[in-house]
């Protein structure tokens, strides 16, 4: 497909959880990775590492751990009962069902990309004590979003997921990610992103209007 207008690509980059088995080219993945690598990071530290999984056996391994993680997570979710209307309830059920589908079929998605970040001291200290300068993953998630928007521009669907962190130890070991000499983890998983051609269509997802969550100059000073 032709390259999309930037705003259209951004506003139609929604979580895709159902994919066809159509192969995804290495060239397209490399394009998305180049876009990811151009994302800004604090102090230009560029902490992320990417693990691209296309091997069917390794995808199956990831699929098993993802499914096990989602099983635990799903059981912990209470069934909401305070929906404002049936449309909101139906939307919640669709998202839940699509997430379940992804958990059961992750191994069938052509490409799985894991975004890793090092476990390192992050912050600064002066004579007054520690300074809160934000979290290291704030320098990783812009790369994830760049990747997803680039994929959208190529007609590929993605979803930013994190539930795999429940079984991060097993997944990192399966991928051969090095640990520290004492056996403690050297990296953690910031995100697992499936990549493939979507079942269905892209579109603008329902969201709160920006005006509802925007305050100008002072809190609650909103514009209609």
Please report, for each region that a protein language model flagged, where it lies by residue.
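Short, surface-exposed beta-edge/turn micro-motifs
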Residues: 47-48, 109-112, 189-190
């Amino acid at each position: 497909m032709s390259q999309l207008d930037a705003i259209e690509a951004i506003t139609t980059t929604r979580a895709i959880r159902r994919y066809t088995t159509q192969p995804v080219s290495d060239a397209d993945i490399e394009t998305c990775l180049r876009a990811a690598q151009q994302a800004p990071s604090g102090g230009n530290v560029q902490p992320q590492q990417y693990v691209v999984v296309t091997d069917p056996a390794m995808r199956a391994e990831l699929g098993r751990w993802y499914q096990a993680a989602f099983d635990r997570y799903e059981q912990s979710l209470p069934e909401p009962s305070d929906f404002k209307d049936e449309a909101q309830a139906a939307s919640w059920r669709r998202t839940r069902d699509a997430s379940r589908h992804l958990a059961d079929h992750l191994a069938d998605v052509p490409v799985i990309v894991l975004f890793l970040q090092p476990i390192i001291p992050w912050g600064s200290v002066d004579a007054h004590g520690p300074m809160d300068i934000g979290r290291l993953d704030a320098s990783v998630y812009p790369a994830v979003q760049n990747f997803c928007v680039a994929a959208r521009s190529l007609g590929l669907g993605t979803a930013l997921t994190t539930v795999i962190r429940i079984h991060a130890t097993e997944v990192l070991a399966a991928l051969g990610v090095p640990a520290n000499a004492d056996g403690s983890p050297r990296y953690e998983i910031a995100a697992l992103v499936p990549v493939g051609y979507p079942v269905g269509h892209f579109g603008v997802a329902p969201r709160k209007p920006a005006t509802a969550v925007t305050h100008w100059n002072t809190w609650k000073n909103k514009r209609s």
